[in-house]
Amino acid sequence: MKNPSELKDLLSELEEKGGGYFVDFVTTKGIQAGIMRLHPCEIDAQEPHSADEVYYVIEGNGFINLNYKNHPIKQGTSIFVQAGSEHRFHGNTRDLLIFYALGK
């Protein structure tokens, strides 16, 4: 973990991973935080988590399906997802870049 982390470095790390769509920059006993990037038509395959989550849209737009209801999202949108809730990002027509943080 590099502290502080720069967005350009995290995006480079995503490119180097070749296949992943998220990268953590903080992983401790109490918190996990990072960025995720979804290309258009890429599938968000995450499962519900056992901890509450917060998302913030850095750039892009699309939808989040939260508990089987679609909500539009765009740059500047913040989203709270309660532990155990079904959620998926989808419908973006350009790259969707999102900050996330969740308890552990």
Regions inferred by a protein language model and the residue ranges of each:
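A short, N-terminal "cap"/entry segment at the start of jelly-roll beta-barrel domains
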Residues: 1-35, 45
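A generic "binding-loop/recognition-motif" signal
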Residues: 31, 50, 69, 85, ...
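Short beta-strand/loop turn elements enriched in aromatics
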Residues: 30, 40-51, 104
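Ligand-binding loop in jelly-roll beta-barrel domains
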Residues: 83-104
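Short, surface-exposed secondary-structure edge patches
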Residues: 45, 54, 68-71
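Surface-exposed loop/turn positions
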Residues: 29-31, 42, 77, 85
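Short acidic-glycine-tyrosine-enriched beta hairpin
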Residues: 68-83
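Short, conserved beta-strand element in jelly-roll/cupin
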Residues: 38, 49-64
